[in-house]
Amino acid sequence: MDDGFLTSIGNGRTIALMLKLRDGPCIMKDLKEIVLNFQSLKIRLNEMEKDGLVNVTTSLDGHKYVVVELTDLGREIAMLFSITNMAVSPNKNISEKSIDMKHFDTVVRLLRGKEYMVQREIVKNIKTFDTVIRVLDAMESDGLVIKEEVHEGVRQIRYSLTPLGEQIADVFESVHQKMMAV
């Protein structure tokens, strides 16, 4: 898969971080409620900073602490994700939604514009079968994909985006294009 296809958005919990930061700058330790492991949080924020979504600065106002805030690009993308979050399973918390899962971005953009995609083709692009199935099952639960089992000589499991799934895929593609333009 093309390295330019993958961004920090495809990492789990990135959208939840952006939605939290949309309210304003946060001290890094306050983001641990979203990404519980400090090392994972630090890595995620470094990737988001490299993608131009956040600025991470160290402040020495008596105590040393790390402040994280969205860049202009990050604010624009966070607004798109805020609308997306409201459209997808509005009664669920962001942590329960497929849109904030690791590899959702990759899966939804792979399916975008296609009539359907066979499960094994999706797995080929991500290489983690269990993760792909977890994401696809969550997407089906959120009403973003339709799963169809077909027996045409060989058993195939096909996935296609619902109309809402297509709209969400368009948002994620737009976000990807904005990030690649930086």
Task: Enumerate the predicted regions with their spans.
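Short, Lys/Arg-rich nucleic-acid/phosphate-binding segment
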Residues: 58-67, 101, 149-159
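Short amphipathic alpha-helical interaction segments
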Residues: 36-50, 126-142, 147
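Short acidic, hydrophobic short linear motifs in intrinsically disordered regions
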Residues: 24-34, 115-125
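General nucleic-acid-binding
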Residues: 33, 39-73
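Short alpha-helical segments that sit at the start of domains
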Residues: 1-15, 80-108
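Short helix-to-turn junction characteristic of helix-turn-helix DNA-binding domains
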Residues: 9, 18-24, 110-114
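Basic, amphipathic "hinge/linker" alpha-helix immediately C-terminal to the N-terminal HTH DNA-binding motif
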Residues: 63-81, 158-172
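Short glycine/proline-centered loop/turn elements that form peptide/ligand docking sites
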Residues: 6-11, 40, 96-101, 131-134, ...
